[in-house]
Amino acid sequence: MSNISKETVEKVANLAKLEVSEKEATAFAGQLGKIIELVEQLNTLDTNNVEPTSHAIDVSNVLREDVATKGLDRKEVLKNAPDEQDGMFKVPTIMEQ
C-alpha cells in the first residue's frame, strides 16, 4: 500500500509550478494514493506470455487517402487578412537578418 503525503503533493505541485490549497493537497494525496495502489496491482500480473504491442486493440490505417482537392479562393481568404502583399499574408518582421 502506498501512502502519498500532503507534503509530497505540495512538493510536486511546487516543482510543476502549480498552486494547490491545503484542502486540494489533502484530497489529491488520497486520490494519488489510490491510483498508485491500482498501478501496484497491475505490477503483480504475470505478463510473460503476453505478446508486446503498442496498441491494446488491433489498429489498421484509418486515415483517408491523400487526395488533392480544390482549396479556398485566395481573394476570399485574403479579404480577412489585416495586411497582404503580392497575394500572400503579410506579417510583422520578428527577426532581422
UniProtKB/Swiss-Prot annotation:
EC number(s) reported in the record: 6.3.5.-
The entry's keywords: ATP-binding, Ligase, Nucleotide-binding, Protein biosynthesis
Origin: domain of life: Bacteria
Pfam families for the chain: GatC
Recorded catalytic activity of this chain's protein: L-glutamyl-tRNA(Gln) + L-glutamine + ATP + H2O = L-glutaminyl-tRNA(Gln) + L-glutamate + ADP + phosphate + H(+); L-aspartyl-tRNA(Asn) + L-glutamine + ATP + H2O = L-asparaginyl-tRNA(Asn) + L-glutamate + ADP + phosphate + 2 H(+)
Leading EC class: ligase
Purpose of the protein: Allows the formation of correctly charged Asn-tRNA(Asn) or Gln-tRNA(Gln) through the transamidation of misacylated Asp-tRNA(Asn) or Glu-tRNA(Gln) in organisms which lack either or both of asparaginyl-tRNA or glutaminyl-tRNA synthetases. The reaction takes place in the presence of glutamine and ATP through an activated phospho-Asp-tRNA(Asn) or phospho-Glu-tRNA(Gln).
Protein family: Belongs to the GatC family.
Complexes and interactors: Heterotrimer of A, B and C subunits.
Protein name per its UniProtKB record: Aspartyl/glutamyl-tRNA(Asn/Gln) amidotransferase subunit C
